[in-house]
């Protein structure tokens, strides 16, 4: 099930459970995890993109190891809310991971990377450190926004 509705997504998870947030980019996938009670999202890792089969294997392993019950995937909409070329590629990614058998929420990720980058700049993180952290922190930002909307 792929949905943009937090209500539908929440209904698909009656017992809650751990969620994974994904910030899907062209070169990387930022991954974040939250606790089973949907209290707080934490950055987990950054997956360097390869062929989809390789990406899927890494995600499947993470989902199994962390007992993930649902996926929240950031959807990069244009500022006016319309779809962009990246939006279409993220929707295709969601369709490709649908066989995992987990509910999937597509969550508006506008400004997530910019918000995280601003926080890292304010923390005086070096350019290399920002590059290392931005994707998984953006995934945590996306996931936290979704869980805040559901509780």
Swiss-Prot record:
Q: Which EC number(s) does UniProt give?
A: 3.1.-.-
Which of UniProt's keywords are assigned here? Cytoplasm, Hydrolase, Nuclease, Ribosome biogenesis
Q: Protein name, please?
A: Putative pre-16S rRNA nuclease
Please report which protein family the annotation says this sequence is part of: Belongs to the YqgF nuclease family.
- Under the cellular component aspect of Gene Ontology, which terms does the record hold? cytosol
Recorded source organism is Rhizorhabdus wittichii (strain DSM 6014 / CCUG 31198 / JCM 15750 / NBRC 105917 / EY 4224 / RW1) (Sphingomonas wittichii)
Q: Which residues cross the membrane?
A: none
List, in alphabetical order, the GO biological process terms annotated in this UniProt record. Answer: rRNA 5'-end processing
Role this protein plays: Could be a nuclease involved in processing of the 5'-end of pre-16S rRNA.
Question: Which InterPro entries does the protein's record reference?
Answer: RNaseH-like_sf (IPR012337), YqgF (IPR005227), YqgF/RNaseH-like_dom (IPR006641), YqgF/RNaseH-like_dom_sf (IPR037027)
Main location per the UniProt record: cytoplasm
């Amino acid at each position: 099930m792929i949905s943009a509705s937090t209500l539908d997504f929440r209904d698909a998870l009656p017992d809650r459970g751990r969620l994974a947030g994904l910030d899907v980019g062209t070169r990387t996938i930022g991954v974040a995890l939250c606790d089973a009670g949907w209290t707080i999202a934490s950055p987990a890792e950054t997956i360097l993109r390869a062929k989809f089969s390789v990406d899927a294997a890494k995600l499947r392993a993470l989902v199994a190891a962390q007992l993930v019950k649902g996926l929240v995937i950031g959807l990069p909409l244009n500022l006016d809310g319309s779809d962009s070329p990246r939006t279409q590629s993220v929707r295709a990614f969601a369709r490709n991971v649908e066989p995992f058998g987990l509910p999937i929420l597509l969550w508006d990720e506008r400004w997530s990377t910019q918000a995280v980058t601003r926080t890292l700049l304010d923390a005086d993180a070096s350019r290399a450190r920002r590059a290392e952290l931005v994707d998984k922190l953006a995934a945590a930002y996306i996931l936290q926004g979704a869980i805040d909307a559901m509780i």
